[in-house]
Design a protein with these regions (language model features):
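Active-site recognition of the HExxH zinc-binding catalytic motif
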Residues: 112-131
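Cytosolic juxtamembrane segments of membrane proteins
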Residues: 55-62, 72, 196-210
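Auxiliary, metal-adjacent structural segments of Zn-dependent hydrolase domains
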Residues: 23, 28-114
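Short, compositionally biased, intrinsically disordered N-terminal export/targeting signals
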Residues: 1-13
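Long, well-structured alpha-helical subdomains associated
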Residues: 18-27, 32, 36, 139-192, ...
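Short, aromatic-rich amphipathic segments at membrane interfaces
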Residues: 130-138
């Protein structure tokens, strides 16, 4: 058979560049389609967050009090002044909030979403107090970078027969979907820890239990966003890898495929 080769007693035929190109295109389309499901995970959170604008006054005083109650003020943590948010539209319009580790500022519009502030204070506690939270915080961005890198690795061609010995790169190619998922877990865990600490902090300020119950519901939806991102990233990368494996790995020739 033309262009075929033997390995370990089996006959194989390399895949053509056309096969690999088809795999690349299909893998890219499937990956994009899977990643397109992300808004379904974030919508429950964003929808409730907008509704919380109307009840902001119920949380604002307790949140501002929480910085002292937690001792974060002694660590230099501050709530960013309103003018600081003018160039950050998501935070300014109450669509998001975040804790900046570099300047120790909680970026939040306290006239709109103070309910989210306790969670951001939880991020500050992770960053400044304790070992596990700080470690997870440091692992977030490297983990997300690795997950993104796995998206590229998934599109690499598979030039070895399935039965050939595997090296480190082969292992990464074969498991890039799992690696992408695991790489996102530090973000999920750190977010969950921040919410847990935020709820505990809210109780210390004397916030009423019905309000805390509502807060926990919001934070659970926020965690769903991050958990969904991890699952979707793993599935998208894994699907791309399987497609490229199918289209680019050398094909074993069976006896019934050989014509004389």
């Amino acid at each position: 058979m033309v262009n075929s080769f033997y390995y370990d007693g089996n006959q194989y035929i390399p895949r053509t560049q056309s096969d690999s190109s088809k795999g690349f295109i299909l893998a890219s389309l499937v990956s994009s389609a899977i990643m397109g499901t992300l808004p379904a995970f974030s919508k429950p959170f964003s929808t409730q967050l907008v509704k919380e604008h109307y009840d902001n006054y119920l949380y604002k005083d307790a949140f501002e009090k929480s910085i002292k109650v937690s001792g974060l003020d002694k660590k230099g943590v501050q709530i960013a002044p309103a003018q600081f948010l003018k160039d950050r539209s998501p935070e300014f319009f109450g669509q998001n909030a975040c804790y900046n580790t570099e300047n120790k500022k909680i970026l939040i519009n306290t006239d709109k979403i103070s309910i989210a502030g306790f969670h951001e204070a939880g991020h500050a506690l992770n960053d400044l107090k304790g070992i596990s939270g700080k470690l997870l915080s440091k692992m977030r961005w490297p983990g997300r970078a690795v997950a993104g890198l796995m998206g590229y690795v998934a599109l690499f061609q598979r030039t070895k027969p399935k039965e050939a010995p595997r090296d480190k790169m082969d292992f990464i190619k074969d498991n890039c979907g799992k690696i992408a998922f695991v790489s996102m877990l530090p973000t999920v865990l750190e977010e969950g820890m921040a919410s847990y600490k935020g709820v505990k902090l809210a109780r210390k300020t004397g916030l009423a239990e019905p309000l805390i119950k509502n807060m926990k519901k919001l934070y659970a939806k926020a965690l769903l966003t991050y958990a969904g991102h991890a699952v979707v990233a793993g599935l998208a990368v894994g699907a791309s890898s399987m497609i490229m494996d199918y289209f680019s790995r050398p094909k074993k020739i069976k006896d019934e495929d050989i014509f004389y």
